[in-house]
């Protein structure tokens, strides 16, 4: 019942977050016309240069693009979201057109990342199926730990790989054993040991002599990974690491030669012969620092497109293909560098509309610091 002395600082803070029920604004531009009193010529006002010609502003354009590229929504789902969450009614054609407009302004950012990739010491490359209408096409990707660049192409052959990587790559390219990469010089191509392990596991799970040699080859690959992990964690000196790797390489080749002759299945014999033929490509990491043993980086980056592909109906035009490869390049690069792709896209749209300096990746990173 006595007086209460209230402390200056609160003992508890309770915050409630909410979003506005009306989350959009409309700016109407009224254009007038008039007639010349002397020649009767009609003169019509035009929109200012810094006003979007379409019905969507920069924030809405960026939102629509991110719903596709980052959150893998189909056009129908985006249409439903705009209606349900914001009360905005746009046709599927208008949403598709908005994606095309975003794609057009992303060209400089996309080309900048693609050119930067050619200067990286080590890159990863992989491809996956892509659908355009009723045609089966391919989504290619080259990436590093900090960059990703996607490209759609009708071919899965060397022609497409050259378009993405260049005719004579000077960097080290980590790939699987696919023949489309055979044009790359053996000194600049590292085969993925995870793919090799997968193939050898299949051999070990077979029967007869297949199982015998497959089990031995799998054991050698696991020793390879253990040695690499110990070396990277500084538990093994460089000299001991190289000595053990050299012995392992000799044992690996001996077992492959035996398996290529004695496996009971021609399929596995040929697989072992192919590894013998490409033996130099398996060991490039020994002569170049920083070359990983696997192509897991590319497979992780491609997963974003695989998820998008599963939840949508593909594309039906060249414009749709360009949008996918460019928006995925922006989104995946931002993910790897912990940047906000929505903010970068807004900055690009704003700079394009106002004809100011275009923010490339390095410019946007500098602005975020």
Which ranges hold each PLM region?
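Short linear motifs in intrinsically disordered/low-complexity regions
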Residues: 4, 8, 19, 355, ...
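Short Cys/His-rich Zn2+-coordinating modules
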Residues: 12-24
């Amino acid at each position: 019942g006595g007086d209460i002395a209230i402390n200056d600082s609160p003992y508890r803070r309770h915050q409630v977050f909410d979003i506005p029920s009306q989350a959009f604004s409309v700016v109407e531009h009224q254009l007038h016309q008039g007639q010349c009193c002397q020649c009767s010529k009609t003169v019509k006002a035009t929109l200012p240069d810094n006003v979007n010609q379409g019905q969507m502003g920069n924030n809405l354009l960026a939102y629509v693009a991110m719903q596709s590229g980052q959150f893998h929504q189909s056009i129908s789902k985006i249409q439903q979201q705009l209606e349900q969450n914001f009360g905005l009614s746009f046709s599927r054609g208008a949403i598709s057109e908005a994606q095309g407009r975003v794609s057009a302004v992303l060209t400089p950012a996309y080309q900048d990342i693609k050119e930067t990739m050619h200067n990286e010491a080590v890159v990863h490359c992989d491809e996956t199926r892509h659908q355009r209408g009723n045609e089966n096409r391919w989504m290619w990707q080259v990436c590093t730990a900090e960059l990703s660049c996607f490209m759609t192409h009708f071919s899965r052959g060397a022609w497409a790989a050259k378009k993405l990587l260049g005719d004579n790559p000077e960097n080290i390219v980590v790939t699987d054993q696919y023949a489309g990469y055979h044009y790359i010089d053996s000194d600049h191509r590292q085969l993925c040991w995870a793919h090799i392990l997968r193939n050898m596991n299949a051999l070990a799970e077979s029967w007869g002599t297949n199982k015998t040699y497959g089990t031995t080859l799998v054991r050698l690959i696991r020793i390879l990974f253990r040695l690499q992990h110990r070396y990277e964690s500084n538990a093994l000196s460089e000299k001991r690491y190289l000595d053990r790797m050299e012995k392992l390489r000799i044992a690996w080749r001996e077992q492959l030669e035996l398996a290529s002759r004695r496996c009971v299945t021609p399929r596995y014999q040929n697989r072992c012969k192919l590894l013998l033929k490409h033996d130099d490509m398996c060991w490039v990491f020994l002569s170049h620092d920083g070359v990983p043993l696997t192509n897991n980086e590319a497979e992780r980056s491609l997963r974003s497109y695989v998820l998008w592909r599963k939840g949508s109906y593909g594309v039906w035009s060249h414009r749709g293909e360009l949008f996918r490869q460019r928006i995925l390049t922006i989104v995946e690069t931002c993910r790897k560098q912990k940047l906000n792709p929505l903010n970068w896209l807004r900055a690009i749209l704003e700079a394009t509309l106002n004809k100011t300096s275009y923010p490339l990746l390095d410019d946007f990173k500098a602005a975020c610091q």
